[in-house]
């Protein structure tokens, strides 16, 4: 085997090892995004909520900076309660529909799906009812969220 072939083989192996450590994309975050769009009637893009305040986005700590951030903390706590029930809230898909008054869970028989859908619908409606303060997007969480 030529040295160049060994280098290519090594590069492929390293790439595969790196790909194996990439976590799967949570399934229900796409659904949650649709629920948010349904609740706010498309008035604000979903990505605006991904890095807002201390709790909107990955993780969370400290005191929520405003009502919208409080919605995110409540949603995080709801997901925590779902995990205590043995559910995997970020991975569950569920049935819902978008009505004139916002999103609703369909008649869901499985407890985990019903619970997580309720968490997401409550949060989406909370987001729609809370004012959005541009100054709280992409804040320095090490300074404001202790």
Curated annotation (Swiss-Prot):
Biological process (GO) annotations held by this record are: arachidonate secretion; lipid catabolic process; phospholipid metabolic process
Gene Ontology CC, one term: extracellular region
- EC number(s)? 3.1.1.4
The catalytic activity, as recorded, is:
a 1,2-diacyl-sn-glycero-3-phosphocholine + H2O = a 1-acyl-sn-glycero-3-phosphocholine + a fatty acid + H(+)
Matches recorded under CDD domains: PLA2c
Alphabetical list of InterPro entries matching this protein: PLipase_A2, PLipase_A2_Asp_AS, PLipase_A2_dom, PLipase_A2_dom_sf, PLipase_A2_His_AS
Q: Has keyword Calcium?
A: yes
- How many and how are cofactors bound here? Binds 1 Ca(2+) ion.
Name recorded for this polypeptide: Phospholipase A2 PS22
Q: Which organism is it from?
A: Drysdalia coronoides
Give the organism's phylogenetic lineage.
Eukaryota, Metazoa, Chordata, Craniata, Vertebrata
């Amino acid at each position: 085997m030529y040295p160049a072939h060994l280098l290519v083989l090594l590069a492929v192996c390293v790439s595969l090892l790196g790909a194996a450590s990439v976590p799967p994309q949570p399934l229900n975050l796409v659904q949650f995004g649709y629920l948010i769009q349904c609740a706010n009637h498309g008035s604000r893009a979903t990505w605006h909520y991904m890095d807002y305040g201390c709790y909107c986005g990955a993780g969370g700590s400290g005191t929520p900076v405003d009502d919208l951030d409080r919605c995110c903390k409540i949603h995080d706590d709801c997901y925590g309660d779902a995990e205590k029930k043995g559910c995997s809230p970020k991975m569950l898909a569920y049935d819902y529909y978008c009505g004139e008054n916002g999103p609703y869970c369909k008649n869901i028989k499985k407890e985990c799906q019903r619970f997580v859908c309720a968490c997401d619908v409550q949060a989406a409606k909370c987001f729609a009812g809370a004012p959005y303060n541009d100054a709280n997007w992409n804040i320095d969480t090490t300074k404001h969220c202790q």
